[in-house]
């Protein structure tokens, strides 16, 4: 009887775990405000330091997706290989660091947005 209850409990847990969905992240409502607050001062053309060094403009969704003179910074659907995520998560040995570090929540929002396809929504 006890084994049956554990089995039933395990099945119920797995069924409920599958029902939990991640929140949909919006570029306009969630991502853009983070970039404006933490990144735009350096990545704003024509004179932002980050823009001058890399060509990366974060002034719009389109310019962000265009990337740098070296290539893209976002791989839609893959935050693990997106340079943006590597930089804000300190997974990349670089001098590119936001003057004001992102919070754990802001990093999670950027990661989830990229993993959800980095859409302009």
Predicted regions: what is each one?
Residues 1-2:
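N-terminal secretory signal peptides that target proteins for export/translocation
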Residues 6-17:
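Bacterial N-terminal signal peptides
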Residues 19-121:
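Aromatic- and Gly/Pro-enriched helix-to-coil junctions and flexible linker segments
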């Amino acid at each position: 009887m006890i084994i049956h209850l554990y089995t039933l409990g395990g099945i119920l847990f797995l069924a409920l775990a599958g029902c939990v969905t991640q929140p949909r992240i919006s570029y306009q409502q969630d991502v853009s405000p983070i970039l404006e607050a933490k990144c735009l001062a350096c990545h704003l053309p024509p004179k932002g330091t980050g823009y001058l060094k890399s060509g990366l403009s974060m002034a719009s969704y389109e310019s962000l997706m265009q990337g740098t003179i070296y290539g893209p910074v976002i791989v839609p659907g893959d935050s693990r290989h997106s340079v943006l995520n590597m930089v804000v998560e300190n997974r990349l040995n670089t001098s590119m660091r936001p003057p004001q570090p992102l919070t754990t929540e802001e990093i999670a929002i950027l990661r989830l947005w990229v993993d959800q396809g980095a859409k302009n929504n």
